[in-house]
Amino acid sequence: TGAGKSVCYQISALLLRGVTIVISPLISLMKDQVEALRQVGIPAAYVNSSITQEEFYHTVQMVQQGQCRILYVAPERLMTDSFFRLTQQVPVSMIAVDEAHCVSQWGQDFRQSYLDIPVFMEQLPARPICTAFTATATKQVEADIARILKLQEPEIIHTGFDRKNLFFGVRRPNNKTRELFQLLRENDGKSGIVYCSTRKAVEEVCDALRENGFPATRYHAGLSDTERAQNQDDFLYDRQPIMVATNAFGMGIDKSNVSFVIHYNMPMDLESYYQEAGRAGRDGSPAQCILLYSGKDVRTNDFLLQRSRETTEVEDEETRQFLLEQGKERLKQMTFYATSTTCLRHRMLQYFGDHSPDSCGNCSCCLTNYREEDATTAAKKIISCVYRAQKGGYHLSRTMTADVLMGSKKESLLRMRLDQLSTYGIIEKLSRREVMQLIDELIQREDLALRQFQEYQELVLTAGSVEIIRDQKTVMRRVPVVREKLAAPVGTKDPTLSAADNDLFQKLRQLRAAQAKHEG
């Protein structure tokens, strides 16, 4: 993310004869990149569902007359008769597949239409050079891309996933809105993005920020094209330095001075989180990437995964089930990151197959003091609760298990007669949050597992559960010595400015905004 993937195929296109076809799933990104190329004198165009038939014919004429060097196209248009005829009439020098992870069922954003790409290339008069680009491919996805696109002994270039100027942090606040306010005060006068998982959350968070004096705007697919464009410009030119948005915002946005990215809700997978967080600090300056986590995020994402299974364009039932299972596995890895007590950067880089030290010194886990605590007794109580619930015919989720162990008086729990279990209320020395954290740690260690049951995931026992009960394994957990305090990223100073410095800072912001507008 932000490493210059687009430049790779744009410069290559200028060195080749004929037209370069860039396959991209993002209509807004096509428009932005074509406009940027035209501003520097490079003839480019795009073909997608947003253009009229007249505009398409005009684009065809440009390509036929050699007046277009780079043609962006949506994957859905590749196999249409009109586009096929065009590609038979002009020399295609290169195919550039952007967001190439979309071709793989192992990827976080599989698109059925991407499977048309190898078929399309086979129908061309001569097979052109094929290049593929992605910011978020695991080793498995990388191999899948090469196989599906039929790349013969491809040159594979890794720029690495580590962005050393980014500080990664996770907070688990009781009140996310209050925590967000505090983070924004710590970054007063700076530009940043607040990501939310739903349109409703975007509206609520943006309204709350405005009501409390924060200069915020919003972006999601439910807004009109005009409003989205206006809000995007307000953010790019620092008229509204805080953008509250769904993941519909940010792809291809070239704004270098984003000082923070805050995730108000946890994304579905580490690929999405890395890509969205990576929009911070593109100028190389220290920047913060903060995740505000709660257990509710897991339940929300699990619901969204189930819903996506029903709305996917994939018709084959077996493939749909496979995609759902892959989504659940990615959500599990994302949850492991959010609940980790070890280096966040190491966990993320390890997921993508990058080597890294066990400790980076620039994440909230590395900068928090922990002590080791024997939690075997509490773990046995959790495992016993799951066992006795299953024996009684119950299917308990993570939260239901914690409620039983804490002796909750919730009406739903009492109605199910869960208070009759012998493990009801047997944990007294831990808070509910600590019980939930220990459950998550047991899942990470594979001493418990999650299994789909109806509309939610239930806890089930594993071989590790038996080992703990039989005293063949101990459970040690890391406990913060003091309440986690988010340290400033490496290289930053106290954010408080004097009156004179603040006046100068505001003038510099105005100057930068004017320059950005002038340069387009």
Question: How would you label these PLM feature ranges?
Answer:
Residues 322-354:
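Short, charged low-complexity linear segments at domain edges
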